[in-house]
Amino acid sequence: MTKKIEDLILYKDEHYFSSFPSIVLLENNTLLLLFRRARDSRWLLDAEDEESLLIKQQVDHVDSRSQITKIFFNTDLQAISEPEALTINPEAADQDASLLMLSNKTLLLSSFSWYPVHSRVAGALQKKGVSLYGHPDVTGCFYISWGGFTRQSHDMGKTWSAHDYLPVLPNTRDIIPEKRGRHGGATRGQAIEVGNEVLLPVYAPLKNDKVSCSHLLVSNDAGVSWQYRSIIARDQEQKLSLNEPSLLQLEDDKIMAFLRNTSGNDHLITTISNDRGKTWEDWQERKVIGHPTHPLKLKDGRIFICYGYRHEPFGIRGHLIDSSGTNFIGEEIIIRDDGFCGDVGYPWSVQLANGNVLVVYYFTENDGIRHIAGTVLDIE
């Protein structure tokens, strides 16, 4: 049985749209929280009329100045540092943060970025076949998906290396024809370390595909350089985009991937590899509804997954799975069901020193302020 101990607000500021968190337990049992922070001009709206309420519900996931922000917490889950933005990318806007502590005590951050494009050059770029996202009337400008990158910290998150873009994915369309390839696609999900390899999941469409698929990159030097290994999952029928993959090591070289089913019925997709991702079994649609999924192996060997639930009632949910990744255990865990709108989710979990599990996520309550929240669970 799972018992909720408490809900927490970890960071909330009406001037910012805070979202897409990741968290890691450091050596001294303190916690490092990273999340995307962007400007949010909705704080200027004082009215509670119908139009203002609709604006507060609107999704706004791109901003030309979005940044990855860090906060350190103690074992009592109290902030012990002020929010501080990591050094920014001077040419593009940083998005989701995904963290991994390596065995050599290096912190690996993977993320991706959007390149802002002025409206006066948008038409010419589109004629060249460049795919643009957004519109100045809605998102302030146009954007180009600029690729995935990694950064490293060798001092427990105090300082970080520069943005290092991932290699170009094979058999994918250039972001800018003959000028910029698709560097790693996008990343949102858990990387893992297996033996002497770091396995990093990413996602991007193949050159002739209509939908996106998930790919695996591998590093043999603790995340300094990367090579392409395989396609994790792809819909041969070209109906489902299989995105935002997260990895979990089951045992030895056996790993499991958890994927978002973007253009289908929002059911969780999973697949297993028995050789560190060189080959993958056929992917399966599971009974869980929600996205994206973060998997956590508990100290007793069971797997705890958490995911956003963007259907009424909006919130955060979870489930237990046996150690093989095959069978779901018990009933679905309702972590939160009081969201103001569907703009919630992207949870990440960590087991604390006392055995409890902390789930962090972004959330929206009736005031419309997107913030980073957390829930502490006692999982028996």
What are these model-derived regions, one by one?
Residues M1-E380:
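Asp-box/BNR beta-propeller blade signature and adjacent active/binding-site loops
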